[in-house]
Amino acid sequence: MKCSTFCFWYVCKIIFFFLSFNIQISIANPQENFLKCLSQYIPTNVTNAKLVYTQHDQFYMSILNSTVQNLRFTSDTTPKPLVITTPLNVSHIQGTILCSKKVGLQIRTRSGGHDAEGMSYISQVPFVIVDLRNMHSVKIDVHSQTAWVESGATLGEVYYWINENNENLSFPAGYCPTVGTGGHFSGGGYGALMRNYGLAADNIIDAHLVNVDGKVLDRKSMGEDLFWAIRGGGGENFGIIAAWKIRLVAVPSMSTIFSVKKNMEIHELVKLVNKWQNIAYMYEKELLLFTHFITRNITDNQGKNKTTIHSYFSSIFHGGVDSLVDLMNKSFPELGIKKTDCKQLSWIDTIIFYSGVVNYNTTNFKKEILLDRSGGRKAAFSIKLDYVKKPIPETAMVTILEKLYEEDVGVGMFVFYPYGGIMDEISESAIPFPHRAGITYEIWYIASWEKQEDNEKHINWIRNVYNFTTPYVSQNPRMAYLNYRDLDLGKTNFESPNNYTQARIWGEKYFGKNFNRLVKVKTKVDPDNFFRNEQSIPPLPLRHH
């Protein structure tokens, strides 16, 4: 009896020892365990292409930094992923999700790397990046005027391939050609056709999403609630979106543009701005008139160097030169628009003109530039956004513009972008993006610089401007745009039982009354909150399910 008891105790002790040892090994080597698991889904002998990178690989840092668009997040102290996967197909995404979940690693999904806070490639806990660079096909169906776009495709690739198939079709999305469709579409996505057709997210008709269980869902199998949520509510909250089906829209064979510079005393400039903010949102959908401001050094008539504010009034008009000049002279004669200020361009050349990748004086555009994923010169940047519902008083506008003088020359910029058009006609609950009727324009506050040691200086300038404009923009809540993510609005503490209460503070700024519906969807499809970041949609606590 004694021997039997002793033997049982001894065997249990040995089993406990080995279990403890294995648990310690598992905890100590999450990367090793992840790679072992992943080998079942991405066998190394299937393709010559390298799809998985660890910190010991020669090209790890070049892959990591290749699409980091904000150089604030390339320092040695920036958290780095244990592993980067670059899937070729949905099965590779499935494997990455299941293996990350199995070993307790977080996932960050990167499409184009333009996340303003770097949250598509940074985490404060051990994590894996799913980099979708290899999944960038764009398949056009001209007959149905639709396209399937993989989430690793850039906006430039989308515009290029649509135009290759039909010059009178396009898609309502952003200006920057290197922005990835994965994040841009799922956060809303506005651009040159916003007043005509709404956001990118308004024109998505299906999607392929890999959920927390590794299942691939389309619109029918995911259900309308989840399909609603991923169009403007941030797809990364609910899974990894592999592809989008988009509705293509009609564009004119030719459009007319101008971008005129106004260099004048600030009080005279503010009179123009005041006229603009009272009229730009009221124009018909066919005309987009926006303006931006930046400081430049000039030499005055006495040969002295001085810093001044340059303002640019820019347009896209779905019509001819004569019609645009006539319209501007009747509605906004103070701008003094002449025929010589205008250019007639094809739609694809209009996109290139405002893409930021060509010189404004260029007229010989090559659309292949839209396929260049490198994006040219990169910089550190910070950006915030406000929505304006009523005209800002001239005295306040003077102070706002003068704040550009408080920043280094050429670093700070403001963009005023009009609403109106079809945006007034779409319900604020049609998709999670709620910013619709009642908004007259947006203000983008931007700082872009080169030296990382100046990060805090420039970020603080943006914060100062943002604080000053508080009384003049949307209120209760002060609204924000998910694609210009802003961690100053708040972060979620995942260890806190009150993370819903914390998230509601910033969540209602991004989503308004749609926030609670997003929480309900999250609770249903990802109750354990596997897909999360500092500003992710939280599930309700278990007691509320």
Curated annotation (Swiss-Prot):
**Residue location of crosslink 6-(S-cysteinyl)-8alpha-(pros-histidyl)-FAD (His-Cys):** 114-176
Cofactor note as given: Binds 1 FAD per subunit in a bicovalent manner.
The active site consists of 484
Q: Which InterPro entries does the record associate with it?
A: BBE, FAD-bd_PCMH, FAD-bd_PCMH-like_sf, FAD-bd_PCMH_sub1, FAD-bd_PCMH_sub2, Oxid_FAD_bind_N
Q: Where does substrate bind?
A: 292, 417
**Keywords tagged on the record:** Disulfide bond, FAD, Flavoprotein, Glycoprotein, Secreted, Signal
Essential cofactor(s): FAD
UniProt cross-references to Gene3D superfamilies, sorted A to Z: 3.30.465.10, 3.40.462.20, Uridine Diphospho-n-acetylenolpyruvylglucosamine Reductase, domain 2
This protein's superkingdom? Answer: Eukaryota
| Annotated FAD-binding PCMH-type domain residues | 77-251
Q: What is the name listed in the Swiss-Prot or TrEMBL entry for this protein?
A: Cannabidiolic acid synthase-like 2
**Gene field:** CBDAS3
